[in-house]
UniProtKB/Swiss-Prot annotation:
Family, as annotated: Belongs to the PINc/VapC protein family.
SUPFAM superfamilies, A to Z: PIN domain-like (SSF88723)
E.C. no: 3.1.-.-
Protein's gene: vapC17
EC class name: hydrolase
Requisite cofactors: Mg(2+)
A single GO molecular function term of this UniProt record: RNA nuclease activity
InterPro entries linked: PIN-like_dom_sf (IPR029060), PIN_dom (IPR002716), Type_II_TA_system_RNase (IPR050556), VapC_family (IPR022907)
Domain of life: Bacteria
Keywords: Hydrolase, Magnesium, Metal-binding, Nuclease, Toxin-antitoxin system
Binding-site residues for Mg(2+), renumbered to this chain: 7, 93
Location of the PINc domain: 30-118
Protein name per UniProt: Ribonuclease VapC17
Length: 133
């Protein structure tokens, strides 16, 4: 069984009723520290914040490694040296990817950013939630 960190791009679609890809069960999903902060950033009020935070607690939380900033700097540099892709990849996605790599987890997403990361991080597992789901 692989644990999958849920990126906000896929999380929004799952909350709206999308079905996880074959082979990924809802019990396989987790969030990470930066993913939680990214999700809560969208809260519209204190009540909404508290409600969303409670909902997120249903997921296992994978903590960032102690060297996360060094890891993200290296990843950003590797992307910059690979056809200048660094400026197109949001910082939260870099933190999520490095947290996933640390835990040997994958990332379930619905955007292009993780495909770029996979180019410079062989072995990084990313699964895209397709539009039809």
């Amino acid at each position: 069984m692989t644990t999958w960190i849920l990126d906000k791009s896929a999380h929004v679609r799952l909350v709206a009723g999308a079905t996880p890809p074959a082979g990924i069960d809802l019990t396989d999903l987790a969030i990470c520290d930066i993913g939680e902060l990214e999700w809560l950033y969208s809260a519209r009020s204190a009540t909404d914040y508290d409600s969303q935070q409670t909902s997120l607690r249903a997921y296992q939380i994978l903590r960032a490694p102690s060297d996360i900033f060094d890891r993200v700097r290296h990843l950003q540099r590797d992307l910059a040296h690979h056809r200048g892709m660094w400026h197109r990849t949001p910082l939260p996605d870099l933190f999520i990817a490095e947290t996933a790599l640390h835990h040997r987890a994958g990332v379930l997403h619905h955007d292009r950013d993780y495909k770029r990361i996979a180019v410079v991080r062989p072995g990084f597992q990313a699964c895209e939630l397709s539009r039809g789901r």
